[in-house]
Amino acid sequence: MKRLIAATILAAVFGLTAAQAQEMRRVVTGLDDRNHSVVLFDSAMPLKPAAPGITATNFWITDSYPPPLTTSDPSGRQIGTAPPDNGTKFRVVDFAPLDAAAEAKLPPEMIMRGITNAPARGIPVKHPLMHRTRSLDYAMILSGEIDMMLDDTSVHLKSGDVIVQQATNHGWVNHGAQPCRILFVLMDSKEP
């Protein structure tokens, strides 16, 4: 009951639907001292509002490659949008619908709430939600629809679509009527 009340309050404050504000369950397995497979963590992940209409939940973060197998939980670290140097970030991001009037009011200097790794190579930003991370990203649209803006074009994506993004300037805008949920795996990369 407490989770439902918290989700309802967060939904109202951040412009999300109650369904979008629900936490996701994460199950992490590992090995015990006998080398038997066990469940290390099985819990709902905390909801983390990122900006009005956007929530992000980190499931796992690593700092090196190959990543160490660990029994500690690295998901609560505050690291920003990009993965750590030589690391990875596994997350889900929810995007609430953004109507044209609200989109027009986004301040040009917003640049995804101050992400410092945007834009690439001095290319002017065409939208306040444009940003860039020095990472190779695998993404899958889990539900809803969204537009991925690039420097010279936009691509409309729907549930089930997969994206492989190679450190490009981009932005996400949900012009639909329903929230959009995207699964991301970000891996630190080297500049071309």
Per-segment meaning from a language model:
Residues 27, 31-32, 37-43, 49, ...:
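Double-stranded beta-helix
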Residues 7-15:
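Bacterial N-terminal signal peptides
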Residues 145-147, 154-156, 167-191:
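Ligand-binding loop in jelly-roll beta-barrel domains
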Residues 1-4:
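Positively charged n-region of N-terminal signal peptides that target proteins for export
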Residues 16-21:
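Sec/Tat signal peptide C-region and signal peptidase I cleavage site
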Residues 44-46, 91-133, 166-169, 188-190:
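Conserved short histidine dyad/triad with adjacent acidic residue
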Residues 40-74:
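N-terminal, post-signal-peptide region of Sec/Tat-exported proteins
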Residues 125-127, 131-133, 138-159:
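A short beta-strand-loop-beta hairpin characteristic of the jelly-roll/cupin
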